[in-house]
Amino acid sequence: MQVYAAAVYSNNYMRGQNRYVKLTDREREILDNLNATGPVLESWHYVGKQQYVDAMRAENARIFLDSGAFSAYTLGVKLSVREYVGYIKRNADILRNEDGVVMASVLDGIGDPLQTWRNQLEMEELGFRPLPCFHAGEDERYLEHYVRNYEYITLGGMVGTSTKQLTIWLDRMWNRYLVDGSGNPKIKVHGFGITAIPIMERYPWFSVDSSSWIQTAAFGGIMTPQWGPISVSEKSPSRHDAGQHACNLTPIEQQQIFDMLDSVGFSYERLSTVYESRAAFNIWCYGVLNTMMQQRKKKEYNHMVQELF
């Protein structure tokens, strides 16, 4: 399974961009390695501007492209299917390719599965076959159709749903439509906005993406492979809550964290004061997470199904 870091270019963390210049050599090394391996997802709504295209092309980027329809919808921006396809065709050289499938998803019709399907057809008529998207809560006949007719699909509409509720819905979708009788996935499936590691591990995803790296950094935290998210910012309100911040853990726990940070080229002092350093550290954690997921990769889905009533 591949874990994509979402919105790295649109947050200006790659070479030549304004946050990149604030990074140390070690932090730049991490971002450079991310670009070299390619697990980055960007939204057309944000990287449609030529400045982002130029930055990605200069670095020989190969990204997974999402339309960004939900973000545009919340801002009252109307996106054009024709313009989206034009962007994809003009910039095919910066898009990731998985076994002949160009990694660009359909322009969603927010809250309207029929419009999403119409957009799918229109994009195909314009000469590009995008990855279709099925959203949580939609008529499952759309999912049945996508599974029958496409080799790689996406699941969306899951952001903001609790892990418990998401597990109930995903158990149903995977068991009914996405795996065969032996528990093997019928097709490749990408999960948009998957932030919970238990959700990543529970199903045989081919890929997922998450923007937790930047969100966690913004809220003053770092993501660690061993202990999960830890608050480190000197401005974090959790500094005053026992056991909720690195500064108020036990001396033994603190030393374990400091030793780990030092071993991978980071300092607690810089992480506690520099937002960009936390973001770079979290990108490093994504790399570790990718390695862990590859080692634990589940090719079969063997969990008890919970029906929705």
Task: Label every model-predicted segment.
Residues 66, 132, 203:
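Conserved, mostly hydrophobic/aromatic
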Residues 129-192, 196, 212-236:
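Glycine/Thr-rich beta-alpha phosphate-binding loop at enzyme active sites
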Residues 61, 204-271, 308:
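Metal-ion/cofactor- or nucleotide/acyl-coenzyme-handling active-site neighborhoods
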Residues 1-35, 248-309:
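C-terminal extensions of enzymes
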Residues 1-118, 303-309:
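Non-catalytic, usually N-terminal nucleic-acid engagement modules in DNA/RNA processing proteins
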Residues 52-53, 85-92, 117-121, 143, ...:
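Generic structural signal for well-ordered alpha-helices
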Residues 195-200, 204:
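Acidic, divalent-metal-coordinating active-site segment for phosphoryl/phosphodiester hydrolysis
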Residues 34, 90-103, 122-128, 176-187, ...:
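A structural motif corresponding to the C-terminal end of an alpha-helix
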